[in-house]
Amino acid sequence: VMDKSIEKYRTIRKTDADLFNTELRNILRTPDYTDREISDTIIENEVKAEWLLPAYNHCFGAAEGYTFIITSDQPLQDIEPFIETYLGGLPGGKSCTEYVHKGGKIPVESVVFSRKAGDSPKAVVSLIFQQDSIDGNIMDLNLKNDVAKGILRMKLLAVLREKMGMVYSVGVSVGATQHPSALCRETISFSCLPDNVQALVDSTFLVIGNMCDDPDSFSGELEDVKTNLIKDWKITKQRSSFWTTQIRNTLYNNIPDWKHITDYEARVKNITSEDVADHIRKCFLKTPVVKAVLLPKDDKE
C-alpha cells in the first residue's frame, strides 16, 4: 500500500484547475493536518507500516460503544442466536476515542477568489455560504434546507436561464453536519461566458433578496417542492437502505425521538413561505460569501 501511494504521488499530474480547487478548499476552512498533502517524502520518512494496525486497534479495535443496525425479513427469534454469536466474538476492552477534531475555521468576511486556470472557454462560478453553528434539531434544519434548495433553484432557473438566457443550468446544494464540529454550507453554481459573470451574480442576489422581501412570490413553487418531497419520501422509504440510514443518523446526531420519520409528511406540510424566507435570509444574506470564479486560461498560456 505504501509503495502504491508513493507511486501515485510521483506520477500524478495536477492541472491548474486542481490547484485552484485546492486553494479554494483552504479558503473555505483553515487547513490543518487532516487535509495536508501526503507526499512521497512524508510516506517514506514518517509512516511506519508496523504502526498501522496498533494505531487502528488503539482507536477502533474494541466493540464497546458501537451501534449495530441489523435489518432482516426473518423473525428476531430466528436470527438472534447468530447475532449473539457474532457479537460475542468481537474483541472486548476500551477504545481510545477521547480526541475529537474541532474542524477548521471558516471565513468571517466575504472573499473573492478568481483565477484564469480553466480549460473550458466558459467561467465556472460558485457562491459559497457557510455557518459554524446549528440552531435546534439538525433534522429540522435539513428539511428546511431541502425545501429552500428546491425553491431557490426553480427561481434562479426562471431568471438566469429563461429570462436572461445566460446559463444552461444552475446548481444549488445545501448540507449540514454536527460532527466533528457544526458546519452548514450552501452553494450556488453555474457556468457562463466570462463577460456575464458579474451580471449573473448580481441577478442571483436580487432573486434571493426578492424571495426574502416577498415570501408570497414563491408560494406556488413551495407547494410543488412539498409535493415532490413527500412523493420521493414514499418511494424511498420502501428501501432497506433508507431505514438503516435513518436509524444511523438518528443515533449519530443524538436525536431524542423518531418524529422526523413518523411525522415527516406533517412536518413538510407545515413549512410556510415565511419559514423559507427566514431560512434563506439567514443562510444567504446574513452570511459572508466566498465568490469563486474559475476563468478560462489566457490563450498565451
Walk through the language-model features, giving the residues of each.
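Mature hydrolase/peptidase catalytic cores and their serpin-fold inhibitory cores, especially
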Residues: E265, E274-D278
